[in-house]
Amino acid sequence: MTVDLNKMGQAAREASRQLALLGEQKKNQVLETVAQELLAKADEIIAANKVDLENATNMPEKFIDRLKIDNDRIAAMAEGVRQVAQLADPIGKIDAGWVNYAGLQIEKKRVPLGVVGMIFEARPNVTVDASALCFKSGNAVILRGGKEALQTNIKITKVIRQALEQEGINPDAVQVITETSHELANEFMQLTDYLDVLIPRGSARLIQTVLNTAKVPVIETGAGICHVYVDKFADKKMAVEITTNAKVQRPSVCNAIENLVIHQDVAQEYLPAIADELQKYNVELRGDEKVCEILGDKATLATAEDWDTEYNDYIIAIKIVSSIDEAIDFINEHNTKHSEAIITENYTRSQKFLDEIDAACVYVNASTRFTDGFEFGFGAEIGISTQKLHARGPMGLEALTSTKYVIRGNGQIRK
């Protein structure tokens, strides 16, 4: 192997010590330089991306959408970096403080995790997002992207490292693995001497592989089998607009819905309107027998597998239920604990949905597409966690920190 992960890990650990001591003003100055360099080197980044796109000509459209970079997306990346710079620095924040019975002053203080490992697929924006968030939270990061985006990731990382050097920061705070073999990926996932946490972003298959292989602690950023439930007290216009937005605005991402659940009392009236709007975008409709009776040849019969499939495409599975309890049970059985929405004008039923749905983000009368660090005001996000330990939902700066207890005394000894 030409890549020495132990050397990369050692270098990242050394860089992380410098980052942990940086003040907020310096961090923000560095991030502004990173944003400026991304914009200044846009042509170089797009040229590198073109090489990756040429090598991916046989890939599906949804894959190409995630891989492609243009001036607008680079501008969005730079804006994301600037958003991170504007956020309050969590490092050094005191979560709690008290004096115990012995007169010890105890504080619970926010500190960096240390060295973060990222494994992701054809999403070059993750390179920028992860670098900015890790830097602002005082962490070094080692990036392992998919082979399909290798040239883009190498170029973006080079631009970021140059910006760090301009500001007198150890460039090894941001490193990319330039070899994409499975053997090296497995070694990376077991780099316990240097990595404090591993964060995968990508398909359900990638995330499961990381969970099965890693010895480093993992924050699971799960796949997105998300639902909209149209309650019997839903506003029809809202049901049509939210369902359509949640499915078609960007179907290749994890917060797009895959399943629509609708109450039988409004299905006869609402479903044709929803179907007509979805079919304007050539969405393929799959449904249970009742759905097919209502929609006729507009829909095909769904299989059991459809309810558990993350399509990331213009396909939706539709289920008619007889009660809100059936809707909740169905969603909890088939979801990936990501994002779920109810459309209803009934407050009591909305509260029931909020209380009983097991997911990182639960919406009332809004699209699941808002599950995003930028939309939540976190700036860029490191991922969307679907687990319950350490972090859950869109992961911003605080999710990349831990705590330490600082205790000050004046000679106390325990008796």
From Swiss-Prot:
Organism per entry: Ligilactobacillus salivarius (strain UCC118)
Pathway assigned in UniProt: Amino-acid biosynthesis; L-proline biosynthesis; L-glutamate 5-semialdehyde from L-glutamate: step 2/2
Function description: Catalyzes the NADPH-dependent reduction of L-glutamate 5-phosphate into L-glutamate 5-semialdehyde and phosphate. The product spontaneously undergoes cyclization to form 1-pyrroline-5-carboxylate.
Source organism, top-level taxon: Bacteria
UniProt subcellular location: Cytoplasm
Swiss-Prot/TrEMBL keywords: Amino-acid biosynthesis, Cytoplasm, NADP, Oxidoreductase, Proline biosynthesis
GO molecular function: glutamate-5-semialdehyde dehydrogenase activity; NADP binding
GO biological process: L-proline biosynthetic process
Family under the similarity heading: Belongs to the gamma-glutamyl phosphate reductase family.
EC number(s) from the headed UniProt entry: 1.2.1.41
Cellular component aspect of the GO annotation: cytoplasm
Protein name: Gamma-glutamyl phosphate reductase
Keyword hit for Transmembrane helix: no
PROSITE patterns the UniProt entry points to: PROA
UniProt catalytic activity: L-glutamate 5-semialdehyde + phosphate + NADP(+) = L-glutamyl 5-phosphate + NADPH + H(+)
Class in the EC hierarchy, top level: oxidoreductase
Lineage, highest ranks first: Bacteria, Bacillati, Bacillota, Bacilli, Lactobacillales
Primary localisation category: cytoplasm
